[in-house]
Amino acid sequence: MDDPLKPKPVPLAAETVLWFEFLLDPHKITQHLQRPHPEPSAMELIVQFISMTPNTAQESVGTPGSDLQNLNQTPSNSGPIPGVVGGAPAPTTPTASGGVGMPHSPQRPAEKGLQLNRKQLALKILELKVATWLKWDLDALEKNLPVIMQLALLRDLCTISYGCSLSIPLPNDFDARISAAGNERAARFALTIYHRMLLRMQLIKEQALKAPRPQNTMYQTVDQLQQFLDTPTQPSIEYLQQLCASTKPFYIFHYDSFVPLRCDDIGNGQNYDVMHLITPQELRAQLHYELAQYYLYTKQYVLAREAAAACNTNLQAIPPQTTLYYCHIRPSELEGLLQACGISAEEQSLLEKFQQSLLNNYTDIVSILRMDNRRREIPFISRRQVELDIEGSISTGILKETVQLQLQVAALNVVRNIFEWGSIFGSVEYFEKYRELDCLPPLVEALQEMLPHCTFKEQAALKHFLIDCLLHQGGQSRQLLQTVRGFGLFSSDELQDIDEQMLQATPPVPTNSLASLSDWMCHSKMSRVDVGALERQLISCTNANTVRILLVKLCATAPGKPLWAINPSWDVPQPLKTLIMAMPVSFLQDFSYVLLGKARELATRGNYIDAVSMLSVLKSENQRQEMAANVQLMCKLITWEILHIQITQCLEEWHQKPLDLQSLGGRCKQCLGALQAGDSIVPRPDILESCAIMLLNLTEFPPLLYLDKRAGPLELPLAFAATFIEMEKMKGPKKVCRDAWELMLSMFLNVPKRGSSGVGGISSLQAFLQRIRHQSVFGLAISMIGKVHNILKDDPNHDLSCEYMQLWPTSINNPVSYSLRSVCETLQWLLSEALSYYPQTISWLKMKGDLDLAIGNNESAMRCYVNALVTGTDYCTMPLQRNVADDYVIRKMIRCAANLGCHMQATVLCQFLDEIDYGIVFKNLSEKSSNFTDAMDAYYSCIWDTTLLEFIVNLHAKRGEHSRKLEAISMMGTLELNANNNEEIKRESAMVRKSRFLRALAKQYLL
Amino acid sequence: MLRQNLLDQLKHFIETVSNGHSCPQLLTSPNLIKLALGFLEELPATRDIVFEYFALLAEISVQLYVSPEMADPKTGMPVSQVKLAGNRQQQQRAPEYEAFNLVKTALQSLVWKGPPAWSPLIANWSLELVAKLSDKYTQRRMTITASCNYWLECSAMHGLMTLINSCFRKLTQPEEEACVEIMLNAFHRFPMTFDWIVARLGGCFPYKIIMQILQCGIKRFVDDYRCHLDSEAGILDYMTSCHEQHLRAAFREMLREGFAPKKPLDVAVVPFLLITTNYSDTILQSLVNVLVEIYTEDMCEVIVQKAPLWLSNKMFAGMQPTLNNAVLRLNERGATLLLTAAKMAEKYVWCQDFLDNSMQELEQWVLNQRNFPLLADLAYEETKYMLWKSCLSTNLFEQQTAVRLLLVVSSQHPNIYYQTISQLLKKSYAQNPNGIGALIRLLGGQSGMVNFPGFTPGFKMVLEDITLDVQVNNRLPVPPGTPTEAFNTFSNLNILARMHKSKNVAPYIKAQHLNQALNECLPKILQIFDCTVNKLVLRIDRDAAERIADKFRAQQSKNSNNNNELCNGKDYGKRTKLEPGEDKVDDEDATRMRLAHLIVDLLNNIEAGSRTTVLRTPLVLKLATLSVKYFFVGLTEKTVIRRAAASHRSYTLLQRQCSARKIARTVCLRELVERALFYHGHLLGQLEVYQLDELEIPEHEHLILQNLHTSSGANSNRSVLHSGIIGRGLRPVLPPSERNCDAEKQALYLKALNACCADLEKPNNVEGYSLVSLLLVELVSTDVMYNGLPFPDEEFTRVTMERDMLIRRAFINSPVLWAVLGLIAGHRPALCYSSVLLRALCATCLHHWRGKNVNRFQPTAANDELMLCTKKMLQLLAMSQLIPPPLTNLHLIIEHFESAEIALLLRECIWNYLKDHVPSPALFHVDNNGLHWRNTNTQLAKVPPQYVDPLRHLMQRKLSTLGPHYHQMFIMGELMEGDSEPDPTARLQIVEID
């Protein structure tokens, strides 16, 4: 209780009047109130008077001497602090009420009449008098008096007016006769006030109930308050409405209506003759106002609006200059009410129109927003919300509008945002979002509308925006730039700067340069040069039609040598060459030869499309010429050549999927079919091999199985295909087809077998592996070689692991005769080849790491592992799964890190194991890091195992490294690592640290 | 006596000699020779006979040499010596064969020691003899070299030649003339067989001989233009091997005359010389060398002027085609010649003819894979440089010729191709935009060649160079402003890449190939980029640190009011001293910045990191990190326009990567957010906290005292209430006006984030934004606890208050956080994941407003941080549709309430609502387009009154200010729904009547 912040009692000011002085001098109150700044104020007086006269029925025990205490305290008691008032009503003990004064008014009250002692009566009169002085302004009373005081005041008012003691709330069936001490007019007034208060109280109900409760004495009052608040309001409403409708004159109290008691004079009650008559308009205005408030409160908005309107009309009906006694409506409040009800005479604000439009399915929204762009009244965020709402409702189909509306609203918002300097809700995605629509015109239109109204500062903002626009609009920027120039906003320097930046975006047009010439410049008029130029064109052109034209032209120059020999490097594959050479010397011969030669040349340069189109032209040309029997043959051969080129293209551009793989596969099958069917003419071995490999890459294995194995280069693809088919059949980790295995193994013999088959040595294997593209084929090859490596190396520490590994035999006969070195090299090469096609294959990355580790290349091994881990978790967005990092990999990483001298990294990695191997941990921790990328304290934030931290703390303590020890301790102290946390938190915190560490590794090893 | 004896001897001699014809053995007896030699001294009268005898001896020797006919016909080397060494007959006849040697020795000594008169005599005789013998015994035509080899193997001939040689050395000037005369006469007589002798002996007075030969040739040429000049050419050719200088001098001399003809003969000079070149490559080479040496512009004029004269020569007129190939035969200076011609080609048609013909031939030869001398010339180091220079020429012909030559040589020497590409890429084409044409044509390669090298290694080569350049800073001092090679290269690569984009411009390079090649070089490009950007980032950091230090110092001195002027003065002094160095650094950084822009442009042009290319993970990470770094570097550009341009570049870059790969998006976003919050926050208006350096701790403060000041314990580092450091006063706080994020940069930053998040293919995909949201939670929230979405009971905030305040502090420190939240708020339901942040903001605001209640008389400033924070939080909630209307308008009116009321509203309307309606994606409806949206207009979504009524009631009490809002928030909608309500004016009338 001894609160130092509590203000100490301040000595009283000299002019402060104490409450009991008013009891002593009946005129004192008037004098006091007439002062400019009475002290205590009118409100305070009311409070004091009321707190001196609690409920008549109340019984309370006063402590002796409390009166005295009270006297001393109350004046300083400036606020409604009931606790202090508590001890006040000492004089109102039952005995006192019975004996002391008996100041009953001369009008005999009924049996229930005023049973008040004089002091109580006097105080009540004073209290009401003050209230009348305040003109019964309920607003003011409400604001300044605690609710309970208000109720007391109301009770006193009713009590005095009716002349009999009443309890608040009035009972439902209240029909109090007015006792002699009462007065009909006064009672009517009181009842009006009562009902008004009843309604008003509803509005502050919550607050009233929550208001600080008086500590003990007012217990009952509070109960009363509850009752009062729970009184049904309908009767009151009806009463007030009746009152409004009635034409009966209405009187209100005059200050002089209340006559204070004198000590010497019992008096004859209140002077009810002195009462004001007020106009019905005034009464109605006030009542309607109150009703409107109540309706608003209870959400009866229609009624509220009517009431508010009525209030307003009534108020208007009162002639200006009239003094109002009863009606305390302030103009601003009335206006507020009218506005709230939407019937204000003021012009509709833009915001209101905007809201209206929202409710009306966005009618006129565009024009409103356009207006707002200039006036800037609607909060920007609301506009953005509308934009998104429109998007949502169009998207869900609620709003049947085109996207155009959305676009326009968005554009207008973008323009408005220019002047919302730094708004956090600005639309940053306008250009991207609407890039498919014509997003610029609405923007420019909106801008142009704005431009004349811009202040200087706003122009700067506008400039920024325009720059942004210009940079966004790649293609249309020129046009926009013209428009922008028209605005005249930019200085010449700035324009130049812009131009410079835009230059980057526009494609350069080389004029008058070598690049713009189609051939070399040849101005010489000599025929030799002309012919030479023609030949050159023939050599360089990439189009069959041009070839045709040029050949005709060249033919006319009577050349000395056959035209097909113009370029000696044109070469034609064998069967075709014989066919062509067998042709009579003719255009067709030249044409065929040249096209075939050129196609081959183009294909080697990677220009597959032109090559294929040339061959196609040639094919149709041949068909057209109908040259005897060879046409069929020729066409067939050309088709195969086309296929060959397309396979090459497909393998080269594997990831871009340039061709329809399905049809390509089909044609490969056909081609191989020719071999199988034993046709007289079979495709070249090259083509057969390509087809086989292509089918392998398309994972169409069955057609390969039926091929003749003896055809040398087909051996490997066939063996692979057979393996795949067996794998499919077995569906399990069974040892399968040893064909491929044997074949592969034979490649690594130290001394290659002679003549056993057409295949021999590493080079043919590489030639085959080079053309592998499909992931599973890669996988198979890798696993096979990996297994060979494992067997030959025979060192379980450096075993490689990969999928498919279990397919292969576990031993090799006579391992000495195989070359481990070439196995290693081939595997290394194959892995990097495979990874260049599928760089995100985690198992290969890990295997490469294993291999590097086996070789002793720790850093590169670590790089591979980290790469695998980072790739497998999408840069640590996904939790580390078992398939990405199992104990096996982690242990290898630990080994790597330790080998690299990064012992702390190794330590942290130990936590990744399923069960932390503290042996390794402690061993690593006690080692000194020998790598500048590693340090004891660099990775504390990645440790989540508290045992580990404890060990570290201990270690630091032993070494006497105090500050580091403190750091480690503070790490241990973090809430997250508390051992009592639930599993989820533990998991989460471990996860966070894991990814933190992984990112650190990635930054070290991959960047 | 003596005389008699002499006579006897003479008689014997004559007899022997006259009989000797039948028997060479007799003649070659050494005695006889001695006798003859004796006569030479004692009987001058017999000199003729003796010499005749000697001639006879020589002839015998020659006969002997010739007879076996064992010489190799090609080389002229007699096979005998080698193969038939053991031949008996040969051995037998050896003395005969060697007989002349005696004579030679004797005569030689005579020449050396005898009176000088002997020399001409012997010389003349020998010449005559040699000529005669040569003519007589030459069976068939041989080349000069072959003849020389052949004859010099013969000892007699060799001896004679030695003799002549010895004599020539003794000759006086006039005698020499005479000798030459004789020689030439002999030459005239036996033009076919004497040439080798001339060639051989010409070495003694080369210039004279050469000149004479030429003169003599020209005479013959003038007489008959069809004459064969083989001998002359042969001699010259032979002599050139040792006496090229003299030949050149002769040519020079003749050309001088030829160009300024005085004698009628002079007119023929040029045609003659040209004709001569047809006979021999060496002559041609020499002539060209001379021509190139003396060539000037003026000379060209002369040539043009005189050409008609020369052309009158019929032979010359007909020989042009052969001339055109001449250049192919050149070992050196061929390229120079061609380029010279090319320079003039515009002016003279004949130059073009020459060029075209030559080039055509050249290319034909290359196609046929033939070797020719010019290739060697082209492969010379010097030629390479010259050609490179010509590639940059403004003369199109020259440029074209250079390019064609380079292409030709490249087909045989791929390394030259790569070097050329590398060189041409390094050059600046700002002055002469045509220059790039050469590069483009060169990249197009030589068509028709199957194995022409690809250009990728060229790119790799230049990039490798530049990497070195960038890494090892400024090996040479460069004047500021000059574009570096790195700059040039990237700008050229850029042009290339952009050209391919506009398809039709460059038919020579397949766009796809170029793109592929550049993408293959991506690791190298990134390496350079890495270097450049990292240096710039370091620079930013340094600048920022300095700026903060300055600012902090100023603030502190303002705070403590004891400005140390002296110290300041010293500081400024230092500053000025440093400036020149700083200027240089600035300049370097400006260059670096320009380079960075260019590289990014290139990356954009080649679409690096797009889905179509396969990239290894490290490369993806690197590209992503660098892109973000570049973005921040771009923010430090000087002008608005440049900042915007740089940012736009990085947007394109970021967007491409992020929509292609998820991992790239993860990295980009993380880097963007991390850097904005932790590393480059100062660019985005982060509240700057200056780390006091340890040294400023007053010395008198003992460690023990300091330890007392800071509470130790596990949580000592987690206390939020750090408003200063004990003993050093309050932390200087920057005025609130500076606490805002620079709007322009903020916008740029948001766009960068958006570029990473936006998925152009799936426009409503909010994955990226959700990622940002989660990232914010990870980075801003202090630990993993209580990071869940639900709002707990408001009571529970006491538990989390400390971390809530830390989160709030983060928002104060980094205002950009608001903007980030604002961005994700627009992409529902991403903001849900940041629930913990919203919760923290809401909880702290709530508490602070409650706290204000104690001191209720202190008015709330409109721009109070608390009020702003509350407003922003309410806006965020509204924007993200986490609170429904009418609560969405709360931010508009919140400032009209008092603190207690605000606290009430926050609790009743916001906290309680969110507690009951957990901010989670489940709140949102996903439509067919994948758009998350909460339709708040439907009846279902209406807010239950318990969350709204407190607000409504509070507002009702402030109708005078909030009237319109009240209407809009509550009534308008209601009335709109219950549309049936009659016109209020109707009721008004009734009242009126009353």
UniProtKB/Swiss-Prot annotation, chain A:
GO terms for biological process: negative regulation of BMP signaling pathway; positive regulation of gene expression; positive regulation of neuron differentiation; protein localization to chromatin; RNA polymerase II transcription initiation surveillance; snRNA 3'-end processing; snRNA processing. Residues 79-97 have a biased composition (Low complexity). It is found in: Nucleus; Chromosome. Keywords: Chromosome, Nucleus. It comes from the Eukaryota. Residues 56-112 are annotated as: Disordered. Its main location: nucleus. Residues 56-78 have a biased composition (Polar residues). A motif (WFEF motif) lies at residues 19-24. InterPro entries: Int8. GO terms for cellular component: chromosome; cytosol; INTAC complex; integrator complex; nucleus. The WFEF motif is required for the recruitment of protein phosphatase 2A (PP2A) to transcription pause-release checkpoint. Component of the integrator complex, a multiprotein complex that terminates RNA polymerase II (Pol II) transcription in the promoter-proximal region of genes. The integrator complex provides a quality checkpoint during transcription elongation by driving premature transcription termination of transcripts that are unfavorably configured for transcriptional elongation: the complex terminates transcription by (1) catalyzing dephosphorylation of the C-terminal domain (CTD) of Pol II subunit Polr2A/Rbp1 and Spt5, and (2) degrading the exiting nascent RNA transcript via endonuclease activity. Belongs to the multiprotein complex Integrator, at least composed of IntS1, IntS2, IntS3, IntS4, omd/IntS5, IntS6, defl/IntS7, IntS8, IntS9, IntS10, IntS11, IntS12, asun/IntS13, IntS14 and IntS15. The core complex associates with protein phosphatase 2A subunits mts/PP2A and Pp2A-29B, to form the Integrator-PP2A (INTAC) complex. Belongs to the Integrator subunit 8 family. This is Integrator complex subunit 8. It comes from Drosophila melanogaster (Fruit fly).
UniProtKB/Swiss-Prot annotation, chain B:
GO terms for molecular function: DNA binding. It comes from Drosophila melanogaster (Fruit fly). The keyword Transmembrane applies. GO terms for biological process: negative regulation of BMP signaling pathway; positive regulation of gene expression; positive regulation of neuron differentiation; RNA polymerase II transcription initiation surveillance; snRNA 3'-end processing. This is Integrator complex subunit 5. It is a multi-pass membrane protein. It is found in: Nucleus membrane; Nucleus; Cytoplasm. Keywords: Cytoplasm, Membrane, Nucleus, Transmembrane, Transmembrane helix. Residues 571-583 have a biased composition (Basic and acidic residues). Residues 559-586 are annotated as: Disordered. Component of the integrator complex, a multiprotein complex that terminates RNA polymerase II (Pol II) transcription in the promoter-proximal region of genes. The integrator complex provides a quality checkpoint during transcription elongation by driving premature transcription termination of transcripts that are unfavorably configured for transcriptional elongation: the complex terminates transcription by (1) catalyzing dephosphorylation of the C-terminal domain (CTD) of Pol II subunit Polr2A/Rbp1 and Spt5, and (2) degrading the exiting nascent RNA transcript via endonuclease activity. Belongs to the Integrator subunit 5 family. The gene is omd. InterPro entries: INTS5, INTS5_C, INTS5_N. Belongs to the multiprotein complex Integrator, at least composed of IntS1, IntS2, IntS3, IntS4, omd/IntS5, IntS6, defl/IntS7, IntS8, IntS9, IntS10, IntS11, IntS12, asun/IntS13, IntS14 and IntS15. The core complex associates with protein phosphatase 2A subunits mts/PP2A and Pp2A-29B, to form the Integrator-PP2A (INTAC) complex. The keyword Membrane applies. GO terms for cellular component: cytoplasm; cytosol; INTAC complex; integrator complex; nuclear membrane; nucleus.
